[in-house]
Amino acid sequence: MKIVTGSTAANLPACVATIGCFDGVHRGHQYLIEQVHNIAKAGGLASCLITFTSHPRQVLDTDYRPRLLTCLSQKIECFEHSPIEYCVLLPFTKELSLLSAREFMRILHEMYNVQTLFVGYDHHFGHNQGEGFEEYCQYGKELGMRMMQSRALVEDGTSISSTLIRSCLLAGDIKKANAYLGYSYYLSGRVVDGKKVGRTLGFPTANIQPLCAEKLLPATGVYAV
């Protein structure tokens, strides 16, 4: 997978792309990514994933403190295990947030060579996110860009989402969170001194201070690793 930034966008081949925050890169995201890969392969196009270098809400609300399932480096690591060929890292700015959906689509088409844009079932973009898939399809016809939409990945009657996984982690249900993620939730950090609880449990424990301050911590407890 090749990482693409603003300076290298001009070198992108014609592609099928999807766009989003992809927090957690969970099974719902993996399902979407697999479809992008298959559509691109069938059409003889490259496959591309476009994501943001920071959470959009952080830019629009400076007081907002996200609780992320994956920081940017972890997301990229997950993407590298997918069949996607290109990953565009797009800085989210206030100027970008003011673009209409049509103008944003024009930029994707002209700057990033997006020929087909494949979006999630609940994905919205453009200023105030006031438009939906029908409007995107109309703009796509005007711009010469095909629009496609994925269905939700449903398990036990529930759509797999980042919000659902956060709820599981905050409730301490790591098993269910991992099932929705498709891999084991993990933290990267350094070991710090704690309350020496391990001495009373009969087995060693370690207190981890996450390297990513925005990383979501599961419910308080002692977890096996």
State each model region's role.
Residues C71-V88:
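A glycine-rich helix N-cap at a beta->alpha junction
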Residues P66-K75, S97-M105:
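Glycine-rich, highly charged phosphate/nucleotide-binding loops
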Residues K2-T8:
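Short acidic-hydrophobic, aromatic-tinged amphipathic segments that line or gate anion-handling sites
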Residues R102-A224:
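Active-site cores that bind ATP or allylic diphosphates and position pyrophosphate for catalysis
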Residues A9-C71:
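N-terminal catalytic cores of NTP/NDP-binding nucleotidyl/phosphoryl-transfer enzymes
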